[in-house]
Amino acid sequence: MTIFAPPARRTTTEASKTFVPLKIEEAVLVPPIDPSLPRNAFTIDVEDWYQSSLDYDAPITDRVVRNVDRVLAVLDECGVKGSFFVQGRVAETYPSLVSALVAEGHEVQAHGYSHRPLYSMNRDELRQELDRAKKTVEDAAGTAVTAFRAQDFSILAENLWAIETLAEVGFEMDSSIFPMRSRHYGIPNWPLGPHYLTVAGGARILEIPVAIWSVGRLKMPVAGGGYFRVLPRRVIERGLRSIADANRPAIVYCHPYEFNADELGEYSDVSRRVAATQGFGRASFAKRVGTVLPKLSFGRLSDVLAAWGLR
């Protein structure tokens, strides 16, 4: 068990000046023996690209519905059920989309409400954001929402106090901490496997990081999203198999818009540079996911946790 002390913070919000001590305890994993349960989780962060990436005040459009349909087509073809982390504004605008996911046997969890990064919020703002996200997604899904993933993995070293707020709002699990340093997010030297975070007062959250392949001193993100679009497929598959060999589940994520190569051409105010970087790899993304999923055992996050003895 260790106590994590954060380095210098990136934000100047008043809330970030208060450090909440976290006890970090590795979760005990029981290697799966039930072949009917998946070993790895396929998760989807459901958001509308323009609103989530360029303008937080923009309306949610039906592009998100059409893009989710593309995801479902791939999952149906692979015979895989996924976990959909749905943004609150999406659930509020298209509640029937969320209820349809549940009806088809997929799992629904929360992905914030506004898509503003959590490190830009103070404690009161964060509590309102999380509470609204949880209630909105639960109302649309008709099921309890117990897991959370922060928009853009925006729980960083300087706002780890957000874990305390997650517990206060009623979340039991989190998949927000990217366990390596990247350009815009991540915490270096963070545990790669599932672990428990205990805050002052005894509240405990199960933290489930996305897939990072550790090769000696090198850490390679094979978790999905842009990494799935940029890295060679064989590297991704090798990394995921290495995680399996290390006896821990691989948590993979993506976004519905990554399955749509034509979407960026629909915006007149998106620069060529942004379109090129955001569109890279989208044309082959669905095929890539459809190739990787059948080669490994993927399913809903709740089933994966049950397989590893964590539920």
Model-predicted regions and their roles:
Residues 45, 75, 111, 148, ...:
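Conserved, mostly hydrophobic/aromatic
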Residues 2, 9-16:
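Low-acidity, Ser/Thr- and Arg-rich intrinsically disordered low-complexity segments
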Residues 4, 19-29, 34, 143-144, ...:
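Active-site-adjacent pocket scaffolds in enzyme catalytic domains
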Residues 74-79, 230-311:
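C-terminal domain-boundary segment and adjacent tail
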Residues 68-72, 95-99, 127-134, 163, ...:
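Generic structural signal for well-ordered alpha-helices
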Residues 78-159, 171-172, 176-183, 203-204, ...:
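Metal-dependent polysaccharide deacetylase catalytic core of the NodB/CE4 family, i.e.
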Residues 55-62, 86-87, 114-126, 150-154, ...:
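The substrate-binding groove and active-site-proximal loops of carbohydrate-active enzymes
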Residues 19-107:
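Active-site beta->alpha N-cap acidic-glycine motif
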